[in-house]
Each structure stands twice: as structure tokens, then as C-alpha cells.
Amino acid sequence: MKKWSEKKAWDWYNSHRWIRGCNFIGSDCANRIDQWQSYGREERMEVADRELQLCEDIGFNSVRLIVDFEVWLQEPVSYMDVLEQYISLCDKHKQSVMIVLTTEAQLPRGDGEFVPKALGEQKYVLGYHQGRLPLTEEQQKLKPYHFMERPDLAKKYIKMVKTIVKKYANDDRVLCWNVYNEPGITIRERSIPILDMLFDAVRSQKPKQPCTADI
């Protein structure tokens, strides 16, 4: 699978109604771990059902779902079930889905062993982006890194990407793949080889949908 031509991209775009929507996360989710973990799943889906109905009512027709590697790492089977539930609810409410496979927002920091965030009850921190406090002075001194920059984690990250893309490569409910959200916004030029590796991983699964990376 190669990069689409400009004509093919415009033909695809013009074949769709005006795409309008939002990044979707239920209002009862303290953060993205809360969105994707199995803990509290039934309650999360009830709220998502109501709020995706609101999306439909106000004229949205597409939403972005941003994956969470730390949850997938700890609950890979359950994670795929939760993803399917979200996509099914979106389809029920006439919302196509853009799946975001990686983003540089709130990368882990440091040079020691990576420890994924604990699952279970998540605490709200009102007034901050995605319910998380700003970095402390000590945290700011630590170097941010992408999971793909750690060899032991990179293999697992690629496995997650391939697993998700393979399952939905020919699914009409998926509008497109946001392979990398805002590459370089945190780690600058270090994002370039990661971008290449992720595009290779996605394209190896031969998705029929377009693949994007927004600046």
C-alpha cells in the first residue's frame, strides 16, 4: 500500500458529506484510562450511548477515538471488546469513527523502567486537560519519550496498532486512520522515524481507509 495520489484523496473527500464532529470521551470518564479499561465498563457505555445521541441530534456525523496504549498493554483482549462497543455505539448514532493510533499528549517521562498507570478507580482533577494535573517541577526536568522509543515497548505498540488496524481495515464504520496525532509537538524531530514505522505498520494491514498524520 502506497501514499494516495492527490486526486484519490480529493475523490475520497468529495464522496463524503461535510465531516463534522469531536474527540469523543464520555463525561463520566476521569481520563482516557477510564474510557478504555474494563472497570466500570457498563456505566461508561450507558453514558456514551446518551452522549453519542446528543452528537447525532446536533448534527455531528463523525468522532475521533484516541487509543490508550497503557490500558491495551494490561488488558489487550478486553480492550478490543471495549473498542468494538464504542464503534458500534457510534454507528448506532450515525457517527463514523476516526481512530487515533498515537498522540504526543502527556507522554511518559524519565529514563528508568516504564510502569503503566494503575487501572481501577480514576480520580477527577477538575479544570485540567483530560483530568490530569500539570507537571510538577521535578517531572518537567525528566525527558519525555514516546513508547516507540523503547525497544521493549515498541514491539508491543506495533502489535497493538496492527491488531486494531487488521480488525477494522475493511470496516465501513471506520472513516480513516489518524496514524499519528500532531507528530513532533513534544519530541520534535524524534517523531519522524516513529511516524515512518507506524505508517509501515498500518499499511502492512492494507486498510481501505485513508491514513493521516495531522500537523
List each model region and its residues:
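Active-site mouth of glycoside hydrolases
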Residues: M1-I215
